[in-house]
């Protein structure tokens, strides 16, 4: 099932929406940024999406980037982010919001410990922007869109297909971002925490 983006936040700007169910913790959203922007918020889930039409200005932690149609993004767990359309033209995004345990299973599992934690607990990797002209990043976005379309259509065994697509997405990300994971930018991390504190007032 696909949802329109609509949510509330608490005093710390943590999103209060429940994404999916405990058994299948994922929700798919069709965001039309020409109708309304997505204000600053954060949640413990990962958020991955692709711009389908127009251009979006995406702010993820301390990074801000204009993302055009065909390109995408990932927001890490617990990171402040906001989106808005660039200009007055129509801007649509396909977005997945899913808990890391969907691909990692229990926190004691090898999947969670070996593959989820290196990204989820890495504060130096607040987010990532994907570009369609880079082959592995185009493949990563194809996995995001496959998971989105499978959620939309709900064919037999769709939960398995969604989990497989997201596992393949995670494997690509881990393979190609080891250098990014190793680098920390202390100033960006401090700036992000300051913004989070300011928004809570």
For the regions a language model picked out, list residue spans one by one.
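Generic protein-terminus/edge-of-domain signal
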Residues: 1-72, 79, 113-114, 124-128
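A hydrophobic/aromatic-rich effector-binding and dimerization subdomain
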Residues: 2-25, 80, 84-148, 179
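Short acidic, gly/pro-rich beta-turn/loop elements at beta-sheet edges
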Residues: 38, 58, 105-106, 181
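Amphipathic, well-ordered alpha-helical segments in soluble domains
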Residues: 47-50, 139-143, 165, 172
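Loop/helix-junction capping segments adjacent to catalytic residues or to phosphate/diphosphate-binding pockets
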Residues: 67, 106, 156
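Short, Lys/Arg-enriched, Trp-marked, Pro/Gly-tolerant hinge/linker segments that flank
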Residues: 126-137, 151-201
């Amino acid at each position: 099932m696909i949802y329109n983006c609509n949510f509330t936040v608490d005093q710390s700007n943590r999103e209060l929406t429940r994404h999916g169910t405990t058994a299948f913790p994922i929700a798919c959203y069709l965001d039309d940024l020409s109708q309304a922007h997505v204000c600053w918020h954060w949640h413990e889930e990962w958020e991955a999406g692709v711009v389908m039409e127009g251009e979006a200005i995406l702010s993820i932690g301390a990074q801000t980037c204009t993302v055009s149609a065909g390109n995408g993004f990932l927001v890490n767990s617990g990171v402040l982010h906001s989106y808005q359309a660039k200009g007055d033209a129509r801007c649509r995004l396909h977005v997945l919001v899913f808990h890391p345990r969907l691909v990692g299973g229990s926190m004691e599992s090898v999947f969670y410990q070996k593959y989820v934690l290196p990204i989820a607990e890495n504060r130096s990797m607040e987010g990532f922007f994907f570009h369609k002209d880079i082959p592995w990043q185009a493949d990563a976005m194809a996995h995001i869109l496959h998971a989105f379309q499978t959620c939309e259509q709900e064919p037999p065994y769709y939960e398995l297909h969604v989990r497989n697509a997201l596992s393949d997405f995670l494997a690509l990300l881990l393979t190609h971002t080891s250098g990014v994971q190793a680098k920390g930018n202390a100033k960006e991390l401090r700036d992000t925490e300051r913004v989070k504190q300011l928004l809570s007032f």
